[in-house]
Design a protein with these regions (language model features):
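An acidic-aromatic pocket/loop used at catalytic or ligand-binding sites
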Residues: 2-157
């Protein structure tokens, strides 16, 4: 095996060594967080499922299709609820007010038209939980997105 000549080390060799060490440190950091926070993350996942299931329907739903997803160390819930008919803006507004009585706070409401389709959205928060509800005109469904903004979320994982 050839020894490294540290006095005549080329620039790209040095960059490669530094990048390799940085990647190793990052992998050790994420791996340690993964191992240490496992129980906390599983508990958070279960809390999010329970919180999503406690969100009532604005009108009677036919189908509730949701899933728990993971991005690195963060879990989030996304779901679609299908209704018997199209949900109106007034019903979505009433639904937001109904969630206010359950401790949720409305952060933002907005309506936009994209490709001649109108969509209405409500962003809510309750403690560390954040939820977005979207509905489109002409469709008999709403999409829900729920995430917990805790210290792991703040770290960017």
């Amino acid at each position: 095996m050839k020894k490294i000549d540290w006095d005549n080390l080329e620039y790209y060799d040095f960059v490669g060594i530094v990048a390799g060490i940085a990647a190793l440190i990052y992998a050790l950091y994420v791996g340690t967080l993964w191992y240490v926070t496992y129980d906390y993350r599983i508990e958070t996942r279960d809390q999010m499922i329970e919180t999503y299931q406690q969100l009532s329907d604005p009108i009677h739903s036919i189908k509730d299709d949701y899933g728990i997803h993971q991005k690195m160390l963060i879990y989030f819930v996304s779901g679609t609820r299908t209704f018997e008919r199209d949900l109106t803006d007034d019903e979505l507004e009433w639904y937001g007010e109904q969630l206010l009585s359950r401790g949720w706070k409305i952060d933002k409401k907005y309506t936009r038209i994209d490709r001649s389709r109108k969509s209405t959205s409500i962003s809510l928060s309750k403690g560390e939980f954040a939820c977005s509800i979207h509905r489109w005109d002409g469709e008999k469904k709403c999409s829900f997105f729920l995430i917990k903004r805790d210290w792991i979320y703040d770290k960017g994982f």
